[in-house]
């Protein structure tokens, strides 16, 4: 039956009652009411005041809170004798909720219930088997009215669910006029009787006779101010939805009564919720035999290395399950010893690893602190007095340790100098010429190829086409110089401007790495100035102009110091015909920026800007000395592959330690003297060769 079917011409009406029960109690006469139903969607429930209840009732029983129950107007009642036959559960003190008392337009009159007879009890006990397996109430209600109900007198059973519980009430009527009622809680029941005659209603409460009448009397007398206000609004209740005031009332009920559930004989939720969580955790840890956690998270921070190994926290020595045979004493002792040995070994490993991490952290902090102090020294003492201090011993020692990145570009510019007197305006002119050349190449690139071979400047400018190919291979791991990268246009501009500035040199493979390192530390114009002056050095000019005679002279000078510092490895290379040009060309062309890690290459650049080309060959000897033991066991192919592809994780301190042991002095001659003597011999051989042939 739906709410919309309720009307004055229909026989279906609604009944709201409060069901309650108590062992040994009985209900005598309840009111047989004729009522007028109000549509449920427009009714507002009215609740009575809070009542004080007896202390003899159990405190741990189920409770529920109903909301949204329709309000009924009750007419003149007719006495209906009802009796409680069999009750199997106990009632709690808070289970009788006065706010859920039956509310109507007029108060319920008190009735004097009569005690049930013995025959009724016996019959009820004999027939009351609706729900025999549970601890809920099984109740028989007798309603011997003047009209007997036939089989056509059906009962519509509604399942009533409250806000806080999932409870139901089931009623059935047979032709014997016996009403079986099975109640799972003190939730309200809505029953609709379909009969041809006037409907008769029964309000049933499963509580004692005395307390039932007391509830109705107290409900009518002890009424609060809020309840009276709700009664005044009763005629207008159909203008509101039933949930408008019911939610407020139920929220107030929840605050007044902190309900608890008794589940499986455990402590009710009310007592558990009020318990301190820290106290509960402590009791659990004491029972489990585990140490309690410190109250503050700061106490979890280890202040030393004496700690439990993290790898063994999940490894717990436990006995066998109860359903398996117990371990023998010898086996259990053996397993315990093995477990303790595992824990000891894990502690040792983690202690060693922690010490290693601690050492690395200390070294890192020390390096950062030294860099910070060096920055102050460079900015406050050295750079303001560059001309007088750059060659002092203090500055040289500080220089060897590495220039801080924040001042590296400035120091490089001062150390390289500007002997070519290149200005920013000259860079703009060369860049504009390079862009014009790119446009001409895009429209008619065959002009350069058709020009006379004697115009070397035009041929060198044609090397602009090669720049695009080489830029994509510059520091590919960084992904900042490739097409679309943040430094692609800057690198392209510097290399293009240089080809126009020095058409006799043009672009040579390897220049892109040098320009890229300068861009990372300098602005575009300053990087172009440093790049042009750096390539103007004798060694770089010899290599980038591919002067074979001068290049061989540099290789010969290198081998002199190679034999002086590493005679064993030098002999091994001679035996395998591994010449210096196989690995030195790549190192010198790119100034180690391609062969070594970038941070290590920048540190080599620091000293190179101070000491010049000599340090480039000294660095090569330092690398050979660092891997001397490995190279002496390799043949030609493996040695060449190793030197052209050095390890990527070279420690800078180890490399510089090896470089510091290299002596750039042979037979009391330094690098410049040896190189000058070799150049003189080379010129004499070239001049004397024709006379020899004559």
From Swiss-Prot:
PubMed:15758561 detected expression at the stage of sexual maturation in testis, mainly in the spermatocytes. No expression detected in the ovary, brain, heart, lung, liver and kidney. PubMed:15200410 detected expression in brain, heart, lung, liver, spleen and kidney but not in small intestine. It comes from the Eukaryota. GO terms for cellular component: autophagosome; cytosol; Golgi apparatus; recycling endosome. Residues 402-612 form the Rab-GAP TBC domain. Gene3D superfamilies: putative rabgap domain of human tbc1 domain family member 14 like domains, Ypt/Rab-GAP domain of gyp1p, domain 1, Ypt/Rab-GAP domain of gyp1p, domain 3. It is found in: Golgi apparatus, cis-Golgi network; Golgi apparatus, trans-Golgi network. Its main location: Golgi. The modification Phosphoserine is found at residues 92, 296. Residues 272-289 have a biased composition (Basic and acidic residues). The keyword DNA-binding does not apply. Induction: Up-regulated in nephrectomized kidney. InterPro entries: Rab-GAP-TBC_dom, Rab-GAP_TBC_sf, Rab_GAP_TBC_domain. PROSITE patterns: TBC_RABGAP. Residues 108-130, 272-305 are annotated as: Disordered. Keywords: Golgi apparatus, GTPase activation, Phosphoprotein. GO terms for molecular function: GTPase activator activity; protein kinase binding. Plays a role in the regulation of starvation-induced autophagosome formation. Together with the TRAPPIII complex, regulates a constitutive trafficking step from peripheral recycling endosomes to the early Golgi, maintaining the cycling pool of ATG9 required for initiation of autophagy. Interacts with ULK1. May interact with RAB11A and RAB11B, but does not exhibit any GTPase-activating activity toward these proteins. Interacts with TRAPPC8. This is TBC1 domain family member 14. The lineage of its organism: Eukaryota, Metazoa, Chordata, Craniata, Vertebrata. The gene is Tbc1d14.
């Amino acid at each position: 039956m739906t709410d919309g079917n309720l009307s004055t011409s229909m026989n279906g009406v609604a009944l709201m009652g409060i069901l309650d029960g108590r062992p040994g109690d009985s209900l005598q006469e309840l009111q047989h009411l004729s009522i007028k139903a109000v549509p449920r969607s427009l009714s507002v429930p009215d609740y009575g005041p809070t009542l004080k209840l007896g202390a003899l009732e159990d405190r741990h029983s189920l409770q529920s809170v109903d909301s949204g129950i329709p309000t009924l107007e009750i007419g003149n009642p007719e006495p209906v004798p009802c009796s409680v036959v069999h009750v199997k559960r106990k009632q709690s003190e808070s289970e009788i909720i006065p706010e859920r008392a039956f509310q109507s337009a007029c108060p319920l009159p008190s009735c004097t219930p009569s005690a049930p007879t013995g025959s009724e009890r016996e019959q009820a006990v004999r027939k009351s088997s609706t729900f025999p397996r549970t601890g809920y109430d099984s109740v028989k209600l007798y309603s011997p009215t003047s009209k007997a109900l036939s089989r056509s007198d059906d009962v519509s059973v509604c399942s009533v669910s409250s806000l806080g519980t999932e409870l139901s009430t089931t009623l059935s009527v047979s032709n014997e006029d016996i009403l079986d009622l099975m109640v799972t809680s003190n939730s309200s029941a809505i029953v609709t009787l379909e009969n041809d005659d006037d409907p008769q209603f029964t309000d049933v409460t499963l509580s004692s006779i005395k307390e039932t009448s007391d509830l109705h009397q107290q409900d009518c007398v002890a009424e609060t101010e809020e309840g009276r206000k709700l009664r005044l609004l009763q005629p207008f209740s159909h203008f509101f939805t039933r949930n408008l005031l019911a939610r407020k009332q139920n929220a107030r009920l929840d605050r007044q009564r902190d309900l608890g559930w008794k589940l499986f004989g455990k402590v009710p939720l009310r007592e558990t919720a009020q318990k301190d969580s820290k106290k509960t955790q402590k009791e659990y840890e004491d029972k489990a035999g585990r140490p309690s956690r410190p109250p503050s998270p700061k106490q979890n921070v280890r202040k030393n290395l004496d700690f439990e190994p993290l790898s063994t926290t999940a490894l717990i020595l436990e006995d066998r399950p109860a359903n398996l045979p117990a371990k023998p004493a010898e086996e259990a002792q053996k397993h315990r010893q093995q477990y303790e040995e595992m824990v000891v070994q894990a502690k040792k490993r983690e202690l060693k690893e922690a010490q290693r991490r601690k050492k690395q952290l200390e070294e890192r902090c020390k390096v950062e602190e030294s860099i910070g102090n060096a920055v102050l020294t460079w900015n406050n003492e050295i750079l303001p007095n560059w001309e007088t201090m750059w060659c002092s011993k203090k500055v040289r020692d500080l220089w060897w340790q590495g220039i801080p990145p924040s001042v590296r570009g400035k120091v490089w510019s001062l150390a390289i100098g500007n002997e070519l007197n290149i200005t920013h305006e000259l860079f703009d002119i060369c860049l504009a010429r390079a862009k014009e050349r790119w446009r001409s190449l895009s429209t008619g690139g065959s002009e350069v190829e058709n020009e006379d071979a004697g115009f070397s400047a035009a041929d060198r400018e044609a090397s602009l086409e090669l720049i695009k190919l080489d830029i994509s291979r510059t520091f590919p791991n960084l992904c900042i110089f490739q097409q679309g990268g943040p430094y692609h246009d800057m690198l392209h501009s510097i290399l293009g401007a240089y080809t126009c500035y020095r058409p006799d040199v043009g672009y040579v493979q390897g220049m892109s790495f040098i320009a890229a390192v300068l861009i990372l530390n300098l602005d575009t114009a300053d990087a172009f100035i440093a790049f042009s002056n750096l390539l103007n050095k004798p060694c770089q000019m010899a290599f980038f102009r591919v002067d074979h005679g001068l290049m061989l002279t540099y290789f010969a000078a290198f081998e002199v110091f190679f034999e002086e510092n590493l005679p064993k490895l030098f002999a091994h290379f001679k035996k395998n015909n591994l010449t210096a040009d196989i690995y030195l060309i790549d190192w010198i062309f790119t100034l180690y920026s391609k062969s070594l890690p970038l941070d290590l290459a920048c540190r080599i650049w620091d000293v190179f800007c101070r000491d010049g080309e000599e340090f480039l060959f000294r660095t090569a000897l330092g690398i050979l000395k660092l891997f001397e033991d490995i190279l002496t066991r390799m043949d030609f192919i493996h040695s060449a592959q190793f030197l052209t592809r050095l390890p990527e994780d070279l420690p800078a301190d180890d490399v510089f330690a090896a470089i510091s042991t290299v002596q750039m002095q042979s037979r009391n001659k330094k690098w410049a003297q040896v190189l000058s003597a070799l150049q003189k011999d080379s010129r004499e051989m070239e001049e004397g060769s024709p006379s020899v042939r004559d």
